[in-house]
């Protein structure tokens, strides 16, 4: 079984330090992103950086189903959430009200909780080489979490000595994500219209937190997780050369680093 390597040399695939806690950057602070941010504020050591990015402002329609109060209306979501979590957990929480495309992303694990193709493309365009991106998306009562960090041309090789150092970016694993249009309604409005389960965002947030925890601890064997609330199932796709080969049409032998002597 392969496990995702957090820290490694992008040229040699030599693991440098797979036992450290990186910064985590959450892009999108609405439904799922709000639950993820709260969980990370508890999960991460206080000395480690937590950054929230969202240029949207809090509206009254967000109050019932997202992590905001009436006092937050008119504030940027990232600002309101960062200040609340900093006070709640007694830790620094940084935030940005600029779009991802306004500059390079900080180093660390990127958690994408956005709901449209252009936002995902912006994340992909501004990742550092080998920077892990955990993408979360959901429908009415189902969702997926995808993990990746590399374009196709960077995948040879990707696996070495039981570790997975590179996986295709989420938008390569599921190109249809780029075709997803921007939502006209918020998660709260979707719930009110019975177009979205009232618990799907919490469920997706919990899955994302488990993935982040396992990547940091060096125990994450997955590259995809699929949740179906109606069926009561959670289906993983393991991070293996065979799966990556099927997705990319790269030969398995090209994905595995030969043993060094």
Regions found by a protein language model. Name each.
Residues 49-89:
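Glycine-rich phosphate-binding loop and adjoining beta1-alpha1-beta2 segment
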Residues 51-53, 96, 111, 132-134:
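Hydrophobic/aromatic beta-strand patches that form the interior of the parallel beta-sheet core
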Residues 35, 73-76, 80, 200-207:
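Conserved active-site and cofactor/substrate-binding residues in soluble primary-metabolism enzymes
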Residues 1-8, 14-26, 30, 105-107, ...:
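Glycine-rich phosphate/adenylate-binding loop
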Residues 40-44, 67, 127, 216:
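Active-site catalytic pocket residues across diverse enzymes, especially alpha/beta-hydrolases
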Residues 20-44, 51-59:
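Glycine-rich adenosine-cofactor-binding loop
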Residues 75-108, 114-119:
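A structured beta-alpha segment of the ubiquitous adenosine-cofactor-binding alpha/beta core
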């Amino acid at each position: 079984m392969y496990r995702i390597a957090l820290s490694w040399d992008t040229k040699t695939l030599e693991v440098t330090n797979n036992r450290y806690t990186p910064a985590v950057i959450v892009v999108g602070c609405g439904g799922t992103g709000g639950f993820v941010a709260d969980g990370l504020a508890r999960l991460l050591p206080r000395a480690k950086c937590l950054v929230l990015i969202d240029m949207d402002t809090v509206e009254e329609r967000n109050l019932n189903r997202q992590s905001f109060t009436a006092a937050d209306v008119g504030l940027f979501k990232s600002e309101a959430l960062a200040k609340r979590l900093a006070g709640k957990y007694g830790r620094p929480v940084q935030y940005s009200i600029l779009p991802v495309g306004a500059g390079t992303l900080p180093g660390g694990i990127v958690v994408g909780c956005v709901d449209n193709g252009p936002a995902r493309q912006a994340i992909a365009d501004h990742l550092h080489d080998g920077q892990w991106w955990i993408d979360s998306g959901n429908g009415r009562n189902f969702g997926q979490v995808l993990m990746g960090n590399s374009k196709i041309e960077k995948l040879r090789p990707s696996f070495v000595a039981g570790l997975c150092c590179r996986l295709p970016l989420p938008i390569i694993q599921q190109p249809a994500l780029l075709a997803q249009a921007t939502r006209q309604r918020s998660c709260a409005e979707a719930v009110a219209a019975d177009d979205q389960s009232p618990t799907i965002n919490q469920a997706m947030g919990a899955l994302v937190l488990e993935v982040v925890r396992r990547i940091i601890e060096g125990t994450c064997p997955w590259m995809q997780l699929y949740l179906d609330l109606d069926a009561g199932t959670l289906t993983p796709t393991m991070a293996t050369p065979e799966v990556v080969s099927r997705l990319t049409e790269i030969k398995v032998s090209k994905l595995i680093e030969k043993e060094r002597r």
